[in-house]
């Protein structure tokens, strides 16, 4: 078949003229020449397809060109055919072009469908037709073959063998005189070849296009779809057809059959100076320049792809997407639907099987998943100060890597990178790579030690089992609240929920060291501060930068957790607990409720460096009346020596009012009071008033002079009576739910107490947890932490104020390296309306049950991705993951 015969197949079904590059494709995928379409519009004032009568809404000039037709015409010009009856390169090139022209005819016109039967695939050997042979595919025996193994086909020279199938390039399966068997290819001469299957490929993953307008040249498909391969575009992309749509797709997403592999190898971009294969070297070199320009054009169109990064559970589309190089196809058979897309902060491509992704200087290389789904390498994140976008965007060729399983590989970003990613609309990518490959790009972060405060039973194979009190080394923290780390007891590595553990930091014993030993910022888990024992009756201890008193002793004896603290200058609040109580009972005894639906503003106490505030008077600040501390449960480590904990606060316009401590002994409990002087110094007063073995009191004061013992006893007695009356009216509390944080619930409205619950404090410094547990069977152990909350005059509200329901936001959380004072003012959080996009079943009593379409009023957004809000449907207030809702 010569070039003219090939071009005769490409004719307009209306005027039967030869189609050229100006031909237009209608939405029904039929192709006609532009002149005919203009004539139809001019005569009928509307455009309908001449074949299927489909109405076309756009003008002729707006219709797209037939890209396949244009490329086919270019291919004819670049690959001139070579006359000759033999099996030369011209014959093979012509056969390939005939195959492509048949595909164009199939999608362009029904009149040309009859031309498909004329295509003849390439074969290994050619011979003139032999008379008397059957019309079935057959071969002529060149030699006698006796067969060496059972199942081989025996034949003699000159026999006509009917071909059934080709086993591989060296063996056929055929039939002679009704006998079937195998025979070698080099013993026969092919007369009529087997019909070669069309070049096809099977989709291994889902391939979806996010921006249909920008990526209109791409061909989306689902897993297990069968595509017809047309040609190879460049090293990583191929062109194909699915149903009536034609477009490009990534080679690594499909598996080719033998015919498609030959076509892909044949269309592989030639290397300059090397023979390009079946076509002549001159033709290959002449086609190099247009090929590069075409590749560059397609590279622009294919630049805006992104893969799923997961974790992140909140789904945000990536605005600045990049393409990176991918290794040869990674064949992973499993596919995960897009349900996991909501948990990874990006919704790009659908999820697929887990695989490791290693970053190197040459690009992104995807390797098959290891035997264990948990990888030990730290996660990789782009540092915020390096312009990676410009660097990665210039990599060639573009990439669409196989999707990752976000539920298996969890990752996180450091605070700096997380902020940069959030600004760019991108979430952290759940990649796990080897340390040596990414160490030069990854900011160094120290692993943190955490202690399990609740037991947790793993639900997936990559999760760790948590036992209460067990220590863990955490080296990755995900934004959805999950941690990745290793158990210091079993040395197992895996992931576990971050709300089941609390950070452990050692108090600095050197008084001259002012650094705050806080855990990594961005974490809202409970803080556990280890302090050294102090000697009873010893001198007053100096406070460290984090507000925890320590002594030169080495052995830690107790763990004290700073609480959310509020107090009143008019009354010294006594927190009463008995050593015989259970953890829950002790927790209930010190938990306070806010009456009248939080009619008073909330002020937070943030642990900061001790500062001098000379000249400030305690009377210059209006504090809420009868505000009480709202401690939350925390584990206690057994100990017998006395220890003291204190929090020192200094603000620009307010004096400090203060928290204090309770020395613990196995037989008796003594009280300690902490007095605050106007100069801002904290003086710890060790053993004072004796109390009964089953109780302890903790007093808070703000006067600069020592009060008489009589007045203090009288005041304590009154407040003890007040507290005992409040405890009888308070509703019973249930056990702490396994939620990311325990929020203090509101009690009944008839309580005579007024106040609001203090917000959470940063981890590692002060945390809203306090509790007690018995050390041994006969000796009670009691701990209580109380403190003062500061409120500005501007935020003081009357009880009848209409805006009293608006909560006050906590002060901004301090970063690890930040030792500066907190902000002078708390800012109210405006309630935002959010719509539930994915239903969420609550995991504890503190969480809300979300149903798709519900409206939630968000009061507070936490750093770990959890929100606190009120459900419009039933009026309940609780916690829920922020990735399950969207702002409206």
From Swiss-Prot:
Localization, UniProt: Cytoplasm, Perinuclear region; Cell projection, Lamellipodium; Golgi apparatus, trans-Golgi network
Pathway per the UniProt entry: Protein modification; protein ubiquitination
Domain remark text: The RING finger domain is required for ubiquitin ligase activity and autoubiquitination.
Protein name per UniProt: E3 ubiquitin-protein ligase SH3RF1
UniProt key word Zinc-finger: yes
Chain intervals with Polar residues compositional bias: 305-321, 520-535, 693-704
Taxonomy, superkingdom: Eukaryota
PTM remark: Phosphorylated at Ser-304 by AKT1 and AKT2. When phosphorylated, it has reduced ability to bind Rac. Autoubiquitinated. Ubiquitinated by SH3RF2, leading to proteasome-mediated degradation.
Function: Has E3 ubiquitin-protein ligase activity. In the absence of an external substrate, it can catalyze self-ubiquitination. Stimulates ubiquitination of potassium channel KCNJ1, enhancing it's dynamin-dependent and clathrin-independent endocytosis. Acts as a scaffold protein that coordinates with MAPK8IP1/JIP1 in organizing different components of the JNK pathway, including RAC1 or RAC2, MAP3K11/MLK3 or MAP3K7/TAK1, MAP2K7/MKK7, MAPK8/JNK1 and/or MAPK9/JNK2 into a functional multiprotein complex to ensure the effective activation of the JNK signaling pathway.
UniProt zinc finger (RING-type) residues: 12-53
Residue numbers spanned by region Interaction with RAC1: 292-362
Disulphide bridges, residue numbers: none
Organism from which the protein derives: Pongo abelii (Sumatran orangutan)
KW Aminoacyl-tRNA synthetase (keyword) present: no
